[in-house]
Every structure is written in C-alpha cells, then in structure tokens.
C-alpha cells in the first residue's frame, strides 16, 4: 500500500512547492518510487503543449516516476486566483471524483505519493467544497509548511488546530525560510517546535533563485514520518 501525504501551508507563497520537492527528493533517496500530485493549480503559463503551472512542473521533475503533465495536474487554470473563482468564470467545475481518481492512478504506480494543495488549508474549490473537505474525504496525513516570518506562529497554530479538528493526522511540519533569517529566527523556530503538535521534519534554507530546483532533500528527516 502506498504511503500518501498531503502538503498544505500556513498561507499562499510560503514555500509548499519547495518543501514538496525536498520531501520527494528525500523519499527517492530512501528508495521509494515517488510521485508528486498537484490536482488543482491556478497561475499557469501558455505553452505549445497547453497551460503549464510552475509548481506542478517542479513536482513532475522531482518525481522518480516519469509522469505525464496531465497526470500530475488534472485541473490547470491560467489566472493566479482562488480556484473556485476562476473555475466558475471558465465554467469548469472542479470535481472531487476526478481528483480522487487521479490519486488512485498514482497509487497504482508509486509507493510514495505526495499531494500538494493550493493556497492554504481552507482554499475553496467551489462554493460548497474546500481542499480541506477533499483531504478529509481521502483521510490523508497532512504535512504543514510554515513560512518562517513575522506572524507565522499564529498562522501555524490556527492551521494545525484546523487539521486536527477535522480528525486528520498532522504527520509533521517543514520550516521554510522565505526570507533571509532575521534576528528573531531562532526564537520563532523554538516556539514553533514547542507549539506545533507534530515533529519538525526539516528546515529549507533561504535560497534566492529557483529553490524548487535545488538539492534540498538533504534537509529532510524522512524517518520522522
């Protein structure tokens, strides 16, 4: 049976993809057949092959399996906005059954599957359904990515409590340095480590350019999952 994890963040732009790539690299190094999955992505570029999202492409590159883009990212939208807004505008409903069937297909090929969300925990996929609802439906263990910056402690605790309130397992968390470490960085890390009810899997350092392409798997302790 495949190991499956869902990666969420304390907000958008906190480094979910950077952390996801690091986790995929670590799992590959541990000998797993890995697959990254970004079921819904907004903010994509037009290419000769169609719309392509940079986060989904990074997951595709960092998977040990050779996966088609549509397998990694079944729902792709051009505008970088909440999925429920752009899907309604385009008349393309996001179906949880499609998201789930995509996950099942990857589980048949890989023994370690990482699913990356969009935005934060409660990102809406429609007027009545959120990413959190789908993760709860799938009963996926959750890995929380915390962008270490001012305000992150409150955001981390709110998200962790919401995950646990849904009855899900908070399997671990990853710290992502979204800026060069400030003078309170060590104190933020100490507080987060004490207050988040899950193990710290690793800390991705500040990287100014293309962090999702860097060899960051070495910063992850996969044995804690």
Swiss-Prot record:
What's the catalysed reaction? (7R,8S)-7,8-diammoniononanoate + CO2 + ATP = (4R,5S)-dethiobiotin + ADP + phosphate + 3 H(+)
Query: Quick one: which pathway?
Result: Cofactor biosynthesis; biotin biosynthesis; biotin from 7,8-diaminononanoate: step 1/2
What Gene Ontology cellular-component terms does the record carry?
A: cytosol
Residue positions binding substrate = 42
**Which InterPro entries does the UniProt entry name for this protein?**
DTB_synth_BioD, P-loop_NTPase
Which residues of the sequence carry a binding annotation for Mg(2+)? 17, 55, 116
Specify the domain of life of the species encoding this protein: Bacteria
Cofactor(s) listed in the protein's UniProt record: Mg(2+)
UniProt cross-references to Pfam families, sorted A to Z: AAA_26
Name the Gene Ontology biological process terms. biotin biosynthetic process
- According to its UniProt record, where is this protein located? Cytoplasm
Q: Which GO terms describe its molecular function?
A: ATP binding; dethiobiotin synthase activity; magnesium ion binding
Keyword Cell membrane set for record: no
Q: Where, by residue number, does ATP bind?
A: 13-18, 55, 116-119, 176-177, 205-207, 212
Q: Where does it mainly reside? A: cytoplasm
Q: Which UniProt keywords apply?
A: ATP-binding, Biotin biosynthesis, Cytoplasm, Ligase, Magnesium, Metal-binding, Nucleotide-binding
| Family membership | Belongs to the dethiobiotin synthetase family.
What does the UniProt function comment say about this protein? Catalyzes a mechanistically unusual reaction, the ATP-dependent insertion of CO2 between the N7 and N8 nitrogen atoms of 7,8-diaminopelargonic acid (DAPA, also called 7,8-diammoniononanoate) to form a ureido ring.
Q: How does it assemble?
A: Homodimer.
By what name is this protein known? ATP-dependent dethiobiotin synthetase BioD 1
Supply the source organism for this entry: Escherichia coli O157:H7
